Structure formats: structure tokens, C-alpha cells
């Protein structure tokens, strides 16, 4: 039989690539993974199934229907439901060939998203017996994923007895078989379990299949009761990067059933156990390790390790990849871990099993102590592989080990971060977070390292007015950026990463904020104004508009720099207020001008002088409202009262007289602690009152002689 042609140039290129695995870890020429691929090709059930062609007239109709649903040009939901019923009626009996057609599969996916519960069951039944073939198809696999998410929501609805038949549906929606009444009452759980039984013999071949592996991942998430991720977000565990981009291009949006988890019936736990047993049976360590570094199969194994603890306390999949927690260093395991630490797919696998849970803490600690602890700094220099594992370990290991990693990295942080190559920016942010979580461990040294790297000529203890713009240039690379381009260039991903990194520095310590102000002053004013209108750099300007809290006290030198920085916005307030990016900056200026009433009044006067232009703009109206400009124009005294209230809030002063003006603003944690102490005191008082009442009743019983039935008994004699 003629072998099917391998699809795509990437597959051909991949077959010509030279194996780059370490010498210690080298699979045989004919690995079990390749044998498994041969089994897929030889399995008749997994061959491309032909369900028929859609003729040109049908394609035109369904394409028009898809466009109608896309624009959603319906007056109300009832009109849309009627349209969907008519399209489903036209598609009856053609569902299988529609989902395998490139154009019509988009229509079927939209129909699944908008279908009622009863229509959803009917579509599910039409796919029965063909789920395996549909999961292995390029187009129908996407429709099947959407159908499974909707099915999970319907299962939860049936569990809480909230499933109702829609009154507006007609009898033609159900099949014309004699037993249609029986089909209508079959639960979604029963249909889902039947589908799982259909998949069960083919699970091992689905693990590393280009399309069905995504379906398998979704099945694991559903039966484990985990959150079903969005299909369009960049960090989704469900779709590939290319698939998410394509989904955005065809404008298919998720409904409310995505980005949440669903309640599952008890039978799903048995199904999860059955699925894990099927995938883990007759598995050997060599084959599992090959799957762990396989681009397609690796995400499936990550999920299996994450959920296997629900049904398997022995953690079979973990021990099919790594040795037990009591084992010593093993040469083969060491070579495999080294490959994980140096390979892009392998490092993503190891990072995921560390970060997302599933693996026991003692398993992770063993790998860290045996194979990573003595070379933390070396791994941190692998900016595309090993550094991600170190970042994951920072938030998983015990405090002592985290401090050890910080001791290794902080002294060398300046040499690890490279803005030119966009290397280890995330490492810098995670080191800051780890230091904060450990009571600001080595904070001063960390700040000093960052200034040595990005502003070596700046003295943060004595900021001077003759500071250059080296800090902004070293962090943002303004020269050569899209700043000032007139071709409407989109900001690049590198610019976005650099901006987020600088914003993290300013959030970490106010000395970075002051340094940023001085760098803004060193720039040409036109260059600074361009930053205010830039899609990414405007966020840097916005986040630099922060004032030192009154509890810490703002030095006079910093106050002078703040005034000089505010002068840069003069005569540009109106244009900024009418811009989508600049309006956020003007909003921030309200709090940034605290204690500087002259500057606040000047900004208000600029807005009032061109009030007509500001009010005509959508963004300008929001700025006008946030600055309370109606009071500024009509009731200036009330506006100044708002300014006075802002100053009192800044100093933490109450509105009533006689309160100390130097009272420090209490932090939220302090207010929460005071509330807890009050509640504790009230509980103690209630307990004391209850105890006093109990003792009083006991004394009465002793005095009047209560019996076991709490009845008072008369006592005769003089001792009564």
C-alpha cells in the first residue's frame, strides 16, 4: 500500500535534522517511539476517514451561514436561535463531512458554541462511533474540543438538576428513529463515558499525534475536574501557539464555559483511573523519557503527572520517568536530567512539573539536590532552558534552599541580565519577588547590582540634576525602537518585555522612580512627549507617577525633582487627555500633584481653557470626570475642598477636628490585625459571660437540689 505523504515542510525538515542529544543519553536507531508511529500508520481505525465531499452549493450556503453567525446580526436571541435551528436542519446527516471540511468546520464550531443543551446532545450522538477519526483530523479535532467543553458544562448542569428542555424547540430537532424518546432522556454523562470507551483502545497512539493529543489533553482536564483553559490566551495549555493565532484570525471567541472548572460525577474518577492505567501499562522508562522530550507528547505527560495523584498514590508516571525518592545519583538519570536542562522542550517539561504541582515535594528536592544545587549559577546562564527551572524552584523549595539560590545569583545578577539579547529579564523580576517573599533578603545588595548594570554613573544616594538618560537607554533601548515612527508600527514584544521589567524596578524601590524622573528630564522634551503617546512606553511614564508615602517622608530634594518633572507636561495636558494612552497619564497626575496645588490648578486651567475639545473626546470626557472639572469650572471652592481632602488622606488625617495631623496611615495588614484583635476580644467576653452563667446555674442546682431530670426537689428540715 502506498504510504501517505508527510504533511508540511517542517516535518520534512525535522526528519533531516541531526540528533543533538548527549552521548550518555542516545536512543537506539529504531526507538520505541518510532515503532509506535508505525503502529499508528498500520492501525486501520486511525487512517484518514473519508466522510464525503461538500458540493459547491452547500459550501456557499454554509459559508454564508458562518458569516451571519460571525457578525451576529440578530435583533434578539430568539431570532438567532431560530436561525441556528434552520442551519442544523439543513446540516442533518451531513455533520461528519462538514466538520472535516476547512470552511464548514468553522460553522460547526460556531453552532456548537451557540447550540442549546438538547441540540448539543444531538450533535454529540451524530459523532458517536467516529470520535477517534475526528480527533485525528486537522479540522474536526478543533470542533471536537469545543464540543467536549460544552459537554462538560452540560454534565455539571445535569448533576445539579438544572437541565431543562427548551420550550421553543420543535420535534424535528431530534432524530427520526423510533427510539428517539429513549435517546432524548440519555444523560450527557452516559454519552461522555461511551465516548471515553471508544477512545480507550487508541489512547497510546493519541499521546504523540499532532491533532488528537490536544483532544486527549482536554479529556484529561475534564475527567480530572481541572480548569479548562481558554483557547485564545497566550499561556493556554490547550492549544499550540500557531493554533491560538489562527483562532484569533477567524474570530471564534470562547463562551462562558471556558476558563473554569466543572463539577464531575463520581464515575469520572474511575474513568481517570482507567485512562491512567491504559497509558501507563506496559510502559518502560526509556519510552516515557522519549515522550517527555517529544514536542507533541510532552504536554500530555505534564498533565498526567499533574492529575495522577487523584487516583494513583504510587505516582506511576513520575516513577516511569525518574527514580524513586530514596535512590542515589544514577548516571543514566543524570544524563537525562542534563538533557532536560539543556533542551527547550525538556526544560519546559521539567519547569511545568515543578511549577504546576502534581509531583511531591520530596521528588523535586531530590532532583534539585542531586543534579542542580551545585551548579545553580551555571544553569542560570542558560537563558533559554535552565534558567526557567531555577525560577520555578525559587517558589517551590524550602526557605533555606531559596536563600541559597539567592546567595548564588544576586552577586552575579548584573552579568546574567542582558537587555540587548532580552535574556533573563524574567529572572531579574523573579529574584526580586523571591527576595521580597523572604523578608527583603539582601535587598540593598540587589538594588546596587541593578544600578551597576543599568545606571553605573548614577548615585542613588545623592541624585543630581546633571544625570544623563543612560538608565532609560539601557533598560528600554529607545534608540532604534518604534518610538517616534510615523508608519504606525506596532510596539514589539521586546519593547513590551523591557517596559515591564522597568516597571517592576520602579515598583520595587522608589530610588528607581527618582532615577527615571531625572532621565526623563535629560531627554529632549519632544522625545518625552512621544513616549507619552507610545503604546508601551506610555505605561512607563504612567507608572513613574508615584509619590513617597507620608509615613516615610519625601525629602526636599525629591520634591524639587518632582516639580521639575511636572513641568514637562506643561501645554500638553489637553492633547494627552484626548489620547487613549495619554489620558491614563493625566488621570495619574491627580494623585501625583498632591501637596503641589499650584501644579494641580495649572492642569485644571489647561483642561478648562479647551473644555470643548476635551468634552468632544471619549477619553477626554473620562479625564474631565476624574478631575471633577465641573466643580473646577462652576464651584471652585468645592473643588479645592476635594484637594484638601486628598491631602488629609495622604497624611492619614480624619475629617473631624482635633485629630493629630502627623498620624501615620495604617497599612491594610495593620487594620486587619486590629479587626482580628477586636473579634478575639469579643469572643473572650462572650465566653466569659457564658461561663459565669454556667457557674450560676450550677450553684442553683447545688443550692436547690436538682435531680438528674433537672426538676427541683423539696428538701424538708432546717438544712433545706
Curated annotation (Swiss-Prot):
Organism of this sequence: Debaryomyces hansenii (strain ATCC 36239 / CBS 767 / BCRC 21394 / JCM 1990 / NBRC 0083 / IGC 2968) (Yeast)
Basic residues bias locations: 1-13
Cell compartment(s), UniProt: Nucleus, Nucleolus
Alphabetical UniProt keywords: Nucleus, Repeat, Ribosome biogenesis, rRNA processing
Protein name: Nucleolar protein 9
Domain of life of the source: Eukaryota
GO biological process: endonucleolytic cleavage in 5'-ETS of tricistronic rRNA transcript (SSU-rRNA, 5.8S rRNA, LSU-rRNA); endonucleolytic cleavage in ITS1 to separate SSU-rRNA from 5.8S rRNA and LSU-rRNA from tricistronic rRNA transcript (SSU-rRNA, 5.8S rRNA, LSU-rRNA); endonucleolytic cleavage to generate mature 5'-end of SSU-rRNA from (SSU-rRNA, 5.8S rRNA, LSU-rRNA); negative regulation of gene expression; post-transcriptional regulation of gene expression; regulation of biological quality; ribosomal small subunit export from nucleus
Any GO MF annotation of the entry: mRNA binding
Amino acid at each position: 500500500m502506498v504510504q501517505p505523504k508527510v504533511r508540511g515542510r517542517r516535518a520534512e525538515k525535522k526528519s533531516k535534522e541531526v540528533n543533538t542529544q548527549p552521548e550518555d543519553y542516545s536512543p537506539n536507531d529504531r526507538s520505541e517511539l518510532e515503532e509506535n508511529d508505525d503502529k499508528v500508520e498500520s492501525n486501520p481505525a486511525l487512517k484518514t476517514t473519508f466522510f464525503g465531499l461538500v458540493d459547491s452549493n452547500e459550501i456557499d450556503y454554509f459559508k454564508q451561514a458562518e458569516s451571519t453567525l460571525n457578525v451576529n446580526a440578530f435583533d434578539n436571541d430568539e431570532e438567532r436561535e431560530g436561525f441556528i435551528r434552520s442551519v442544523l436542519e439543513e446540516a442533518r446527516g451531513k455533520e461528519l463531512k462538514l466538520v472535516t471540511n476547512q470552511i464548514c468546520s468553522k460553522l460547526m464550531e460556531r453552532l456548537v458554541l451557540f447550540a442549546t443543551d438538547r441540540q448539543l446532545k444531538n450533535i454529540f450522538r451524530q459523532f458517536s462511533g467516529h470520535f477517534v477519526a475526528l480527533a485525528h483530523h486537522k479540522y474536526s479535532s478543533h470542533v471536537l474540543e469545543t464540543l467536549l467543553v460544552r459537554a462538560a458544562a452540560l454534565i455539571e448542569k445535569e448533576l445539579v438538576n438544572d437541565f431543562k428542555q427548551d420550550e421553543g424547540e420543535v420535534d424535528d430537532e431530534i432524530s427520526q428513529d423510533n427510539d428517539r424518546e429513549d435517546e432524548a432522556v440519555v444523560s450527557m454523562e452516559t454519552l461522555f463515558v461511551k465516548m471515553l470507551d471508544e477512545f480507550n483502545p487508541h489512547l497510546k497512539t493519541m499521546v504523540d499525534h499532532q491533532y488528537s493529543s490536544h483532544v486527549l489533553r482536554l479529556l484529561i482536564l475534564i475527567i480530572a475536574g481541572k480548569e479548562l483553559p481558554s483557547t485564545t490566551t497566550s499561556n493556554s495549555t490547550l492549544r499550540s501557539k500557531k493554533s491560538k493565532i489562527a483562532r484569533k484570525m477567524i474570530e471564534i471567541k470562547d463562551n462562558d464555559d471556558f476558563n473554569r472548572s466543572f463539577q464531575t460525577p463520581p464515575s469520572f474518577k474511575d474513568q481517570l483511573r482507567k485512562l491512567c492505567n491504559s497509558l501507563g501499562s506496559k510502559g518502560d522508562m526509556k519510552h516515557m523519557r522519549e515522550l517527555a522530550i517529544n514536542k507533541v507528547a510532552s504536554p500530555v505527560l505534564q498533565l498526567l503527572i499533574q492529575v495522577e495523584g487523584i487516583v494513583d498514590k504510587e505516582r506511576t508516571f513520575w516513577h516511569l520517568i525518574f527514580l524513586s525518592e530514596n535512590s542515589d545519583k544514577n548516571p543514566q538519570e543524570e544524563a537525562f536530567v542534563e538533557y532536560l536542562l539543556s533542551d527547550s522542550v525538556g526544560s519546559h517539561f521539567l519547569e511545568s512539573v515543578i511549577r504546576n504541582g502534581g509531583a511531591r515535594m520530596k521528588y523535586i528536592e531530590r532532583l534539585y539536590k542531586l543534579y542542580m544545587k551545585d551548579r545553580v549559577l551555571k544553569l542560570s546562564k542558560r537563558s533559554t532552558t535552565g534558567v526557567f527551572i531555577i525560577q520555578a524552584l525559587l517558589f517551590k523549595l524550602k526557605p533555606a534552599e531559596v536563600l541559597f539560590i539567592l546567595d548564588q545569583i544576586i552577586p552575579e545578577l548584573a552579568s546574567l541580565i542582558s537587555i540587548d539579547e532580552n535574556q533573563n529579564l524574567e529572572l531579574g523580576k523573579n529574584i526580586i519577588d523571591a527576595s521580597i517573599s523572604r523578608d527583603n533578603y539582601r535587598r540593598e545588595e540587589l538594588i546596587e547590582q541593578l544600578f551597576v548594570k543599568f545606571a553605573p554613573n548614577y548615585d542613588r544616594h545623592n541624585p543630581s540634576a546633571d544625570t544623563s538618560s543612560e538608565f532609560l537607554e539601557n533598560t528600554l533601548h529607545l534608540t532604534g525602537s518604534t518610538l517616534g515612527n510615523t508608519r504606525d508600527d506596532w510596539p514589539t514584544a521586546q519593547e513590551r518585555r523591557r517596559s515591564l521589567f522597568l516597571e517592576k524596578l520602579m515598583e520595587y524601590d522608589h530610588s528607581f522612580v527618582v532615577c527615571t524622573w531625572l532621565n526623563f528630564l535629560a531627554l529632549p522634551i519632544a522625545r518625552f512627549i512621544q513616549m507619552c503617546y507610545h503604546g508601551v512606553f506610555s505605561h512607563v511614564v504612567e507608572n513613574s507617577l508615584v509619590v513617597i508615602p507620608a509615613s516615610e517622608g519625601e525629602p526636599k530634594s525629591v520634591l524639587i525633582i518632582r516639580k521639575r518633572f511636572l513641568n514637562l507636561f506643561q501645554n500638553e495636558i489637553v492633547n494627552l487627555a484626548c489620547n487613549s494612552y495619554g489620558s491614563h497619564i493625566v488621570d495619574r497626575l491627580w494623585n501625583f500633584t498632591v501637596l503641589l496645588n499650584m501644579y494641580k490648578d495649572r492642569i485644571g486651567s489647561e483642561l478648562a481653557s479647551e473644555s470643548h475639545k476635551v468634552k468632544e473626546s471619549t477619553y477626554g470626557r473620562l479625564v474631565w470626570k476624574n478631575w471633577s472639572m465641573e466643580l473646577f469650572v462652576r464651584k471652585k471652592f468645592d473643588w479645592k475642598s476635594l484637594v484638601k481632602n486628598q491631602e488629609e488622606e495622604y497624611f492619614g488625617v480624619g475629617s473631624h477636628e482635633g485629630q493629630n495631623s502627623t498620624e501615620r496611615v495604617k497599612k491594610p495588614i495593620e487594620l486587619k490585625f486590629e479587626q482580628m484583635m477586636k473579634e478575639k476580644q469579643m469572643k473572650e467576653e462572650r465566653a466569659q459571660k457564658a461561663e459565669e452563667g454556667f457557674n450560676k446555674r450550677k450553684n442553683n442546682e447545688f443550692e436547690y437540689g436538682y435531680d438528674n431530670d433537672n426538676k427541683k426537689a423539696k428538701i424538708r428540715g432546717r438544712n433545706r
